[in-house]
Amino acid sequence: IIKSKSLSGGTICIGVSEIALRIFLLKKLEKFTELFPDVKIKLTNHSTNQAVNALKAGLVDFAVVTTPVNLTGDMKSESLCSFHDILIAGPKYSQPDNKIIHLEELQDYPFISMAEGTGTHDHYTKFFYDNNLHFNLDMEASTTDQVLAMVQANLGLGFYPEELASEYIMRGEIFPVNLY
Protein backbone atom coordinates (compact mmCIF):
# COMPACT_ATOMS: atom_id res chain seq x y z
CA ILE A 1 0.00 0.00 0.00
CA ILE A 2 2.60 2.50 1.07
CA LYS A 3 6.31 2.44 0.26
CA SER A 4 7.30 -0.91 1.67
CA LYS A 5 4.67 -0.40 4.37
CA SER A 6 7.15 1.83 6.16
CA LEU A 7 4.78 4.80 6.01
CA SER A 8 7.56 6.91 4.52
CA GLY A 9 5.61 7.85 1.40
CA GLY A 10 3.01 6.68 -1.06
CA THR A 11 -0.74 7.01 -1.07
CA ILE A 12 -3.55 5.43 0.92
CA CYS A 13 -6.95 5.30 -0.76
CA ILE A 14 -9.84 5.14 1.71
CA GLY A 15 -13.48 4.53 0.85
CA VAL A 16 -15.53 6.34 3.47
CA SER A 17 -19.16 7.02 4.18
CA GLU A 18 -20.16 10.56 5.09
CA ILE A 19 -21.06 9.88 8.71
CA ALA A 20 -17.99 7.70 9.31
CA LEU A 21 -15.85 10.54 7.98
CA ARG A 22 -17.40 13.23 10.12
CA ILE A 23 -17.84 11.30 13.36
CA PHE A 24 -14.68 9.19 13.35
CA LEU A 25 -12.17 9.45 10.53
CA LEU A 26 -11.41 13.19 10.37
CA LYS A 27 -9.99 13.20 13.90
CA LYS A 28 -7.84 10.17 13.10
CA LEU A 29 -6.60 11.63 9.81
CA GLU A 30 -5.42 14.78 11.54
CA LYS A 31 -3.22 12.74 13.85
CA PHE A 32 -2.08 10.42 11.04
CA THR A 33 -0.95 13.31 8.83
CA GLU A 34 1.07 14.77 11.70
CA LEU A 35 2.83 11.43 12.25
CA PHE A 36 3.26 10.57 8.56
CA PRO A 37 3.42 13.83 6.59
CA ASP A 38 4.84 12.18 3.45
CA VAL A 39 1.88 9.84 3.00
CA LYS A 40 -0.78 11.15 0.65
CA ILE A 41 -4.41 10.35 1.41
CA LYS A 42 -7.13 9.92 -1.18
CA LEU A 43 -10.69 9.80 0.17
CA THR A 44 -13.58 8.55 -1.91
CA ASN A 45 -17.07 9.39 -0.68
CA HIS A 46 -19.50 6.48 -0.82
CA SER A 47 -22.57 5.03 0.78
CA THR A 48 -21.66 2.06 2.96
CA ASN A 49 -22.60 -0.42 0.23
CA GLN A 50 -20.68 1.52 -2.43
CA ALA A 51 -17.57 1.67 -0.23
CA VAL A 52 -17.68 -2.09 0.33
CA ASN A 53 -18.06 -2.63 -3.42
CA ALA A 54 -15.10 -0.30 -4.08
CA LEU A 55 -13.06 -2.37 -1.62
CA LYS A 56 -14.10 -5.62 -3.32
CA ALA A 57 -13.09 -4.15 -6.68
CA GLY A 58 -9.69 -3.07 -5.35
CA LEU A 59 -10.44 0.62 -5.90
CA VAL A 60 -9.67 1.49 -2.27
CA ASP A 61 -7.20 0.07 0.24
CA PHE A 62 -9.76 -0.08 3.03
CA ALA A 63 -13.17 1.32 3.92
CA VAL A 64 -14.48 3.17 6.96
CA VAL A 65 -18.27 2.99 6.96
CA THR A 66 -21.34 2.91 9.15
CA THR A 67 -23.26 -0.26 9.82
CA PRO A 68 -25.17 -2.33 8.90
CA VAL A 69 -22.74 -3.70 6.35
CA ASN A 70 -22.77 -6.99 4.47
CA LEU A 71 -19.30 -8.39 3.90
CA THR A 72 -18.43 -11.34 1.71
CA GLY A 73 -15.43 -13.54 1.18
CA ASP A 74 -12.38 -12.83 3.28
CA MET A 75 -13.43 -9.30 4.27
CA LYS A 76 -13.41 -8.50 7.96
CA SER A 77 -14.98 -5.71 9.95
CA GLU A 78 -14.03 -4.06 13.20
CA SER A 79 -16.21 -1.73 15.22
CA LEU A 80 -14.35 1.55 15.74
CA CYS A 81 -16.97 3.68 17.49
CA SER A 82 -20.69 3.99 17.94
CA PHE A 83 -23.16 6.83 17.50
CA HIS A 84 -26.82 7.45 18.13
CA ASP A 85 -29.39 8.89 15.74
CA ILE A 86 -32.11 11.20 16.99
CA LEU A 87 -35.28 12.38 15.31
CA ILE A 88 -35.04 16.05 14.32
CA ALA A 89 -37.45 18.70 13.09
CA GLY A 90 -37.28 22.24 11.80
CA PRO A 91 -39.31 24.98 13.51
CA LYS A 92 -42.51 24.08 11.61
CA TYR A 93 -42.59 20.52 12.99
CA SER A 94 -41.00 21.06 16.40
CA GLN A 95 -43.06 19.67 19.28
CA PRO A 96 -44.46 22.08 21.88
CA ASP A 97 -43.33 21.45 25.46
CA ASN A 98 -41.11 18.59 24.26
CA LYS A 99 -44.20 16.50 23.52
CA ILE A 100 -43.37 12.83 23.06
CA ILE A 101 -44.68 11.31 19.86
CA HIS A 102 -45.19 7.62 19.21
CA LEU A 103 -43.43 5.92 16.32
CA GLU A 104 -46.83 5.32 14.69
CA GLU A 105 -47.44 9.08 14.65
CA LEU A 106 -44.52 9.59 12.27
CA GLN A 107 -46.92 8.57 9.52
CA ASP A 108 -48.77 11.86 10.20
CA TYR A 109 -45.67 13.93 9.33
CA PRO A 110 -43.65 14.28 6.14
CA PHE A 111 -40.65 11.99 6.62
CA ILE A 112 -37.15 12.35 5.15
CA SER A 113 -34.45 9.69 5.05
CA MET A 114 -31.66 8.24 3.00
CA ALA A 115 -32.48 6.60 -0.33
CA GLU A 116 -33.13 2.92 -0.81
CA GLY A 117 -29.93 0.91 -1.15
CA THR A 118 -28.15 2.69 1.69
CA GLY A 119 -27.32 1.15 5.05
CA THR A 120 -29.34 3.87 6.78
CA HIS A 121 -32.43 3.07 4.72
CA ASP A 122 -31.98 -0.65 5.40
CA HIS A 123 -31.57 0.01 9.13
CA TYR A 124 -34.75 2.07 9.42
CA THR A 125 -36.74 -0.27 7.18
CA LYS A 126 -35.90 -3.07 9.62
CA PHE A 127 -36.53 -0.85 12.66
CA PHE A 128 -40.01 0.08 11.47
CA TYR A 129 -40.75 -3.51 10.38
CA ASP A 130 -39.72 -4.77 13.84
CA ASN A 131 -42.29 -2.34 15.25
CA ASN A 132 -45.01 -3.58 12.85
CA LEU A 133 -44.90 -0.40 10.76
CA HIS A 134 -43.99 0.46 7.19
CA PHE A 135 -41.05 2.76 6.49
CA ASN A 136 -42.80 5.32 4.27
CA LEU A 137 -40.73 8.20 2.98
CA ASP A 138 -41.97 11.46 1.57
CA MET A 139 -38.47 12.54 0.53
CA GLU A 140 -35.29 10.59 -0.12
CA ALA A 141 -31.83 12.07 0.24
CA SER A 142 -28.48 10.95 -1.15
CA THR A 143 -26.50 12.20 1.86
CA THR A 144 -27.16 12.82 5.52
CA ASP A 145 -26.28 16.47 4.99
CA GLN A 146 -29.22 16.62 2.58
CA VAL A 147 -31.46 15.16 5.29
CA LEU A 148 -30.33 17.94 7.63
CA ALA A 149 -30.86 20.65 4.99
CA MET A 150 -34.37 19.39 4.20
CA VAL A 151 -35.28 19.30 7.89
CA GLN A 152 -33.91 22.84 8.33
CA ALA A 153 -36.09 23.91 5.38
CA ASN A 154 -39.19 22.58 7.20
CA LEU A 155 -39.81 19.81 4.69
CA GLY A 156 -40.32 17.13 7.34
CA LEU A 157 -38.78 15.06 10.12
CA GLY A 158 -35.66 12.94 9.80
CA PHE A 159 -33.17 10.89 11.76
CA TYR A 160 -29.70 12.40 12.12
CA PRO A 161 -26.62 11.54 14.24
CA GLU A 162 -26.96 13.21 17.65
CA GLU A 163 -23.28 14.18 17.75
CA LEU A 164 -23.67 16.14 14.51
CA ALA A 165 -27.12 17.54 15.34
CA SER A 166 -26.13 19.04 18.69
CA GLU A 167 -24.57 22.24 17.29
CA TYR A 168 -27.68 22.96 15.18
CA ILE A 169 -29.94 22.25 18.16
CA MET A 170 -27.93 24.64 20.35
CA ARG A 171 -28.32 27.37 17.70
CA GLY A 172 -32.09 26.75 17.50
CA GLU A 173 -31.95 25.76 13.82
CA ILE A 174 -33.43 22.31 14.43
CA PHE A 175 -35.17 20.65 17.33
CA PRO A 176 -35.00 17.14 18.77
CA VAL A 177 -38.25 15.21 18.68
CA ASN A 178 -38.84 12.87 21.60
CA LEU A 179 -39.92 9.53 20.24
CA TYR A 180 -41.68 6.76 22.11
Regions found by a protein language model. Give the residues of each.
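Beta-alpha-beta core module
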Residues: 72-83, 145-180
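Alpha-helical linker/hinge and terminal dimerization helices associated
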Residues: 1-5
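Hydrophobic residues within well-ordered alpha-helices
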Residues: 14, 55-56, 106, 149-155
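Secondary-structure junction motif
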Residues: 95-96, 110-131
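Ligand-binding cleft/hinge of the Venus flytrap
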Residues: 29-35, 59, 104, 121-134
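Central regulatory/effector-binding core of bacterial HTH transcription factors
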Residues: 9-72, 141
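Flexible hinge/capping segments at coil-to-helix
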Residues: 74-111
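Short, well-ordered beta-strand segments
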Residues: 11-15, 63, 88, 112, ...
